[in-house]
A protein has these predicted regions:
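Core catalytic alpha/beta fold that binds nucleotide/phospho-ligands
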Residues: 1-226
Length: 226
């Protein structure tokens, strides 16, 4: 282990029994942890910026697996046709990846499907507020100062994205239809549970997971990867 890796201090957050996630800056991940050979090879043909977020997300996932006692070692992190990541060597584990403007996130669920999303706040059009939020919440958000409106909307949309990732549907799952009340830090939607960990994340993050027994080993569909 390198000296930088030995100084790695990120510790997983536990959303539920068997569901863990990590969020970190890409530069911190790549500065502290080695990139696995399969990930480096897979990123070889990508533009530099895309290769950085690709390898950072997968490196963070491998670190998360080690920290939770599920060390993947050099095993592959593959992607289904829709982009959803999975572990060919560990079909019992659901995984999810996300990246946004220098941040990466990874989640793992034992015997569950999981979805993770991270979003740096950005300008929000009035139409998007009306699409993703209840009329009351859209009105409240519109009245907020710009910076607050961007951040609060990002907390909502990360949960919506995480939910459709956990289902494996991606955008075809119409994330804007997932009801996420303004300011709420946890909730349920159909067979999913979700959390928006406002108290301990510096950037808006959403994590969603299924109940045990809902996991679909061969589940395809989209869901985005890093």
């Amino acid at each position: 282990m390198s000296a930088a890796a030995a100084r790695w201090r990120a510790r997983p957050h536990t959303a539920a029994e068997g569901v863990h996630y990590l969020v970190a800056r890409s530069e911190d991940v790549l500065g502290a942890l080695p990139v696995a050979a399969p990930d480096r090879a897979a990123a070889a043909g990508l533009p530099p910026w895309r290769a950085a977020e690709y390898t950072a997300a997968r490196t963070l996932l491998r670190a998360l697996l080690r920290e939770t006692g599920e060390d993947l070692r050099g095993g592959p992190v593959a992607a289904r046709p829709g982009g959803r990541p999975y572990l060919p060597d560990r079909p019992d584990l659901g995984v999810s990846l996300s990246h946004s403007s220098g941040w990466v996130a990874a989640a793992v669920g034992t015997g569950r499907e999981v979805g993770i999303d991270v979003q740096t706040p950005s300008p929000v059009a009035a139409r998007l507020l009306r699409l993703c939020c209840s009329p009351e919440d859209a009105e409240t958000l519109t009245a907020l100062p710009e910076a607050d409106r961007r951040r609060e909307f990002a907390w909502i949309f990360t949960v919506q994205e995480a939910c459709v990732k956990a289902l494996g549907t991606g955008l075809s799952g119409r994330p804007w239809t997932v009801p996420v009340p303004l300011g709420r830090s946890s909730g349920t939607w159909h067979q999913l549970h979700w959390t928006a960990p406002r108290a301990h994340q510096p950037v808006p993050t959403g994590c969603a997971w299924t109940e045990r027994g809902v996991f679909r080993q061969a589940g395809g569909g989209g869901g985005g990867g890093g």
